[in-house]
A protein has these predicted regions:
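Surface-exposed, proline-anchored Ser/Thr-rich loop/turn motifs
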Residues: 129-152
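Intrinsic disorder/low-complexity segments enriched in polar/small residues
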Residues: 117, 123, 147-149, 153-154
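Solvent-exposed loop/turn segments flanking beta-strands in beta-repeat/beta-sandwich domains
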Residues: 20-24, 150-155
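Short, conserved sequence motifs used for protein processing/export or organelle targeting and
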Residues: 1-127
Length: 156
């Protein structure tokens, strides 16, 4: 993923190989550290992992696979200054990615893999890590908008 602080544009590219022909991907931008009231709690409550935007359809986008089962998808999103009355702080935001079966089919509601990466890297761009998901033959790598890997390999 790449994030431009001046334009607030986030770009996420996901590449991999699916082992299931009927695979979907869901990508969600979340925010943590939101202090607000909550029903049933007294005083202020810290809300974490609150969904801010879906980069895909809520039930996922069907992955278009080539003959070998490979896929590449790219999403861009401009983070707004606020959602409702709450400030959007990119340094408190993550992108969560799930590769899964067809949520509409009760027999296929499996999540094959999932991971998340911070919108704003916690390290310098030279040391930034790519996000990869590994389950069977599924992996996800994050590339910048020029389709260059963010770093050489996963460090998680």
């Amino acid at each position: 993923r790449t994030y431009n602080a001046e334009t607030r544009e986030l770009a996420v590219e996901v590449k991999g190989r699916a082992i299931e022909k009927d695979a979907y991907i869901t990508a969600i931008v979340t925010q943590s550290g939101i202090v607000a009231r909550q029903s049933g709690a007294t005083g202020e409550y810290v809300h974490n992992n609150a969904p801010r935007a879906f980069l895909t359809a809520p039930k996922g986008d069907k992955l278009e696979l080539d003959a070998e089962g490979n896929y590449t998808v790219t999403y861009t999103y401009t983070i707004p200054a606020t959602v409702g009355s709450f400030e959007c702080l990119p340094e408190n935001m993550d992108v969560a990615v799930l590769v899964h079966g067809n949520i509409s089919d009760p027999e296929s509601r499996l999540v094959y893999n999932a991971d998340q990466v911070s919108v704003v890297p916690e390290v310098s761009s030279a040391a930034m890590r790519a996000m990869s998901l590994y389950t069977n033959d599924i992996d996800v790598d994050i590339f910048n908008v020029e389709l260059k890997p963010v770093c050489e390999q996963i460090c998680r």
